[in-house]
Amino acid sequence: MSETSNKTRLEHDCIGQMEVPANVYWGIHTQRAIGTSGLRITDSQHPELIRAYATVKRACAIANEELGLIDPAKAEAIRAACLEIEAGKLADQFPVDVMQGGAGTSSNMNMNEVIANRALEIAGRQRGDYTYIHPNDDVNKSQSTNDTYPAACKLALIDAIGPLAESTKKLAKAFHDLADKHINDVTIGRTQLQDAVPMTYGQEFHAFATLLKSDLAAFDRVVPLLAQLNLGATAIGTGICADLRFRKSAIKHLAQITGLPVTAAPDPVAAMTDMGAYVATSAAIKSLAVHLKKAADDLRLLNSGPRCGFNDLNVPARQAGSSIMPAKVNPVIPECVNQCCFTIFGMDVTVNWAVAEGQLQLNAFDPVMVHELLTGMALLTHAMETFRVNCVEGIEINADLGRSYAQSSPSISAALNHYIGYEHAADIAAEAVHTGRTVREVAGERTDLPAEQLDEILDPIRLARGLGQTCRERQE
């Protein structure tokens, strides 16, 4: 490194020399990357990734010092720089595009250079004095982009699962609360959008909560997959340029730092090419999106009306719905959630394509995978918050209308099958539809069953509860 002016410093690499702004912590590799793609979707937009990468570098520095591979004073300065980055400092020093060629090399070198230059300052040296602390020889010692970048990506995804799971729990609880509130309010169930048999609003809301809880379990299963890392495998899994002891030491220290169940991949070469953890993570996120879309779709449909739709329930009015139709109010929150879910389906396709594109000893497409997954997780986290706060918690049911639907549906004739047979019950249902009367009224004329027994058999709330249990009691 040499000074060219008070505004720049001159650095060199295998391609040649380049001036780097004197006031930045990155170096020549980052400077070249900035001018390469110009997508303006940078690593700094994913703070989880930056924090995770600094954590990986800190664990590696501790391992290198423990094994006597790096001077303790240098290691201390490197660790201190990493801690600052983990705390959110220097966040503006990561300008490389997330989607990059080279399997994350630009991100790795950006991190190496920022750590090296900040460590130099901590050690009382000038930025760019790589004769003392070098981005490759010291910060990146015993490492490659190909083992550290995926490790950082996976830790970032684990970090992002936390708020996503918390939003899922809160939304599930909101549906549980609605279920408890309306466990005795009966309505009609529908299959193929046709009248089916009675159920309670509580059962319907409880089903949404149950689906969300299954997604929480899926996240729990994904974490151990993401926590299986390949540190020390370096370029292609053979561990070239790394001390044989480094792998175990780095994994140990990373587990201690993060408190996560970090383990070493059992087959380093296979782990270098296999991105199965990303597939599993994407699948879990997509499953959540499917269930959210189901809930949003159903609420939107049940909210239809108010005169010519189902009108089973009302979602909160949040905005005027039309520039031409007075008093029209749209279900804007369910529709917003739907669009977020559509985006997640696209995310899943992208991730699966990227995973499938791994060739020979390396998959070069981690950058787009982690970008899509982190973006999708943040999107769903916020979508569930607005769904809960601005929609679900304010839902009001139209209990009288729901009860009328349940009592007047011809499908409750199914309850008569056991007593008079399917064909006779079907005839009663058909006559009820044709004459506009209820099944109870027609059955009173066309069967010998006593009135009290008919009232009991065709009681909508009894039919909804099966053997007299609430949905929660049955589940327990």
Regions found by a protein language model. Give the residues of each.
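Conserved, well-structured ligand/cofactor-binding cores
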Residues: 2-476
